[in-house]
Structures are given as C-alpha cells and as structure tokens.
C-alpha cells in the first residue's frame, strides 16, 4: 500500500490555525471535498504528508488546524476530530504520463456524464460549470487508468504564485475514484478515507497539465489507487496514494 498506518498524536507545543471549507468546495452533498481538505491540513506540515479523514467535513463552519512541530496535525470542529495528519514518505510507483492531447481526448469518455454519484462535486461534478468547479472529467486511457487534461486558472494561486496545495490535492483526489470505478465497476458512492501526497514541482496557472489516476487493488469496502499531475514535458509535479471507502 502507498502509505503506512501508523498512529499519530499531538504531544508537543502546538500552533492553531483557523480553517473553513466553503460549501462551494464540496464533494458529497453538505461535506467538503476530501482532497481539498487534505491539502488545507497538509500545507501546515510540508510537501509530503499523510492525511486520514475520519468524519464528513463540515462546510461553511469554523474549524481549526492544530499542528505540532514534530510533524503531526489535526482538523478540529469544536471538540470533534475531523481528520488527522502527519509527515510521511510516499511509497508509490508512478507510471509515465501521456500527452496533453491524449488526456484532452479522454475527457469525452468520462463515465460521469451518464451516471455520477456526486454531480455537484467541486472537482469532477458535471453540474458545475468550469468557472465554478475544476471540471476534471477523466476518461479511460487503459485498464483501470484514467486521465484528464487540466489548465489551472488564476483562482487557484497562493501567495507564492503557484497553485495552492488545496487545489493540487483536489486534483489528486477524484481521478483515483474514477480509476477504481473503471477497474472494478464499483456501484454506489464511495469516499476518500486517506491520502498520502507528495508535491514535487510548482504548478502554475495557464500552463498545460495532465492528471492521471490508476487502480491499485481492492479489499472488501476499501479500494486503493494512485494519482499524479504531470507537466507538458511529462515530469511529475505531484503524486498521491489513496484509500477509498465504499459507503453505499
């Protein structure tokens, strides 16, 4: 599997950061998108982080990210822990990318055009226009492998001038789910349970990128996948391994 299952606990002096997931950045109805939330928490720890989502993510409400200098953090809603995080090394074999043109062509085969468990999802929802959502519509490019073209907009930029971790991790989220659907024919909704991501290179607005997802395995209600973002030269900008949990 592409991550460890080690427990992590806040034990040292911590720092607290206000956090909020706007309802616009939803995944399932009335819950924040998992990848967006992963990046929101993980940016407090660094460029290689494991985040475990434990409960549905409240939207339009006040939360806190409490971080420990030892490299652990938690997302809290009042006294309830929504997610936990720790620095972790990503162990994932990333396949070679495809061309932007190939990824753009794959969008036409996105199965979510016909049946979509969460059509209002910020990342892959077909009810979201591309000025309101990310519109990452991944189509099959191989057995259990999906891809989409992606040209980030200036909205995604952070203060450093690159696409923020929230949006990079969002891009690393849903393509993995669609790869699992393509490989295993999973019916009914399933949600992100854990993501371990690594940010390798800055991602910029207006540039051409390819996002790919590939299935890695399935055990009962859990399924495992990898995702990556590639630049126009095929170099990996970011990658993630994830566990998804079937809830329907």
Can you describe what each PLM-predicted range is?
Residues 50, 72-74, 226-228:
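Residue-level detector of beta-strand face positions
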Residues 1-18, 70-162:
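Non-catalytic linker/capping segments at the edges of enzyme domains
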Residues 135-200:
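A mid-sequence, solvent-exposed acidic-amphipathic segment
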Residues 25, 29, 37-69, 175-209:
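Hydrophobic beta-strand-centered segment that forms part of the acyl-chain substrate-binding groove
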Residues 23-27, 155-158:
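Short hinge/gating elements
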């Amino acid at each position: 599997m592409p991550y460890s299952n080690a427990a992590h606990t806040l034990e040292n002096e911590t720092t607290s950061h206000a956090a909020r997931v706007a309802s616009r950045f939803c995944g399932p109805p009335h819950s924040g998108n998992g990848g967006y939330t992963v990046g929101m928490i993980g940016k407090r720890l660094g460029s290689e982080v494991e985040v475990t989502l434990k409960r549905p993510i409240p939207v339009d409400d006040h939360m806190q990210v409490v971080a420990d200098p030892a490299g652990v953090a938690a997302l809290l809603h009042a006294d309830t822990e929504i997610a936990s995080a720790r620095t972790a090394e990503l162990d994932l074999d990333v396949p070679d990318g495809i061309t932007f043109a190939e990824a753009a062509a794959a969008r036409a085969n996105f199965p979510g055009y016909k049946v979509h468990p969460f059509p209002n999802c910020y990342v892959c929802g077909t009810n979201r226009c591309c000025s309101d959502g990310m519109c990452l519509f991944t189509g099959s490019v191989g057995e259990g492998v999906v891809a989409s073209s992606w040209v980030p907009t200036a909205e995604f930029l952070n203060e450093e001038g690159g696409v923020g971790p929230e949006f990079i991790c969002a891009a690393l989220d849903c393509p993995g789910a669609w790869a699992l659907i393509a490989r295993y024919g999973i019916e009914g909704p399933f949600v992100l349970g854990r993501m371990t991501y690594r940010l390798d290179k800055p991602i910029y607005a207006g540039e051409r990128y390819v996002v790919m997802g590939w299935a890695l395995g399935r055990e009962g209600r859990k399924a495992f996948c990898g995702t990556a973002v590639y630049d126009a030269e095929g170099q990996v900008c970011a990658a993630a391994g994830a566990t998804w949990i079937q809830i329907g």
